[in-house]
Amino acid sequence: MSSDVVVAIDGPAGTGKSSVSKGLARALGARYLDTGGMYRMVTLAVLRAGIDPADAEAVGRAAQAVRMSVDYHPDGDRYFLGGEDVSTEIRGDKVTAAVSAVSSVPAVRTRLVGLQREMASGPGSIVVEGRDIGTVVLPDAPVKIFLTASAETRARRRNDQNVAAGLADDYEAVLADVRRRDHLDSTRRVSPLRAAPDAVVVDTSDMTEAQVIDHLRDLVRQRSEVAR
């Protein structure tokens, strides 16, 4: 690209946010930051310590003590908790079930937002993915995108992924979990999930991954006057 640009991408799980954000970063020749993985690392640390995710005070203390790092690579990011590679474990069901509760703790968000801003301020263009990037983490980002899709579409996608991974085929259970997480994320007191007023909202329900990436690349060009 001819100049540096910061792209903030928000939205609920199941919108294709992660794969699209990575694809867009590749298309733009930009760095990529998955903030959700950072919340998952804190959640894993909380669970390993035997802390109840609903105990906000204890969760906050754990967040302050945790040591984490992320190595970003085109072929797959690696997440390290205290030097241990936990890239696979943070995607497990136990972490998934607890991450919304842990993420809602103000002390957790305060610590991670600071780290995310530091990471995003580095040289070069960057695509930052999360749930409060355009509203809280990088409110001055020149390009803000909010991906959305119906709960049913997102549940179907996640259930298909589960089946492909050899897990149980249980669409109704997945749909219930999607709706539960949506409620938690949109009603939490600190940094609720919502589109920034100046974000471009893109419904991915009837779009392929490639179509979404192409559309977002065009949006970036329009908003930042950046061309490949």
Swiss-Prot record:
One of its GO terms (biological process) is nucleobase-containing small molecule interconversion. The keyword Mitochondrion does not apply. Its main location: cytoplasm. Keywords: ATP-binding, Cytoplasm, Kinase, Nucleotide-binding, Transferase. Its EC number is 2.7.4.25. GO terms for molecular function: ATP binding; CMP kinase activity; dCMP kinase activity. It is found in: Cytoplasm. It comes from the Bacteria. GO terms for cellular component: cytosol. Gene3D superfamilies: P-loop containing nucleotide triphosphate hydrolases. It catalyses: CMP + ATP = CDP + ADP; dCMP + ATP = dCDP + ADP. Coiled coil: none annotated. Belongs to the cytidylate kinase family. Type 1 subfamily. This is Cytidylate kinase.
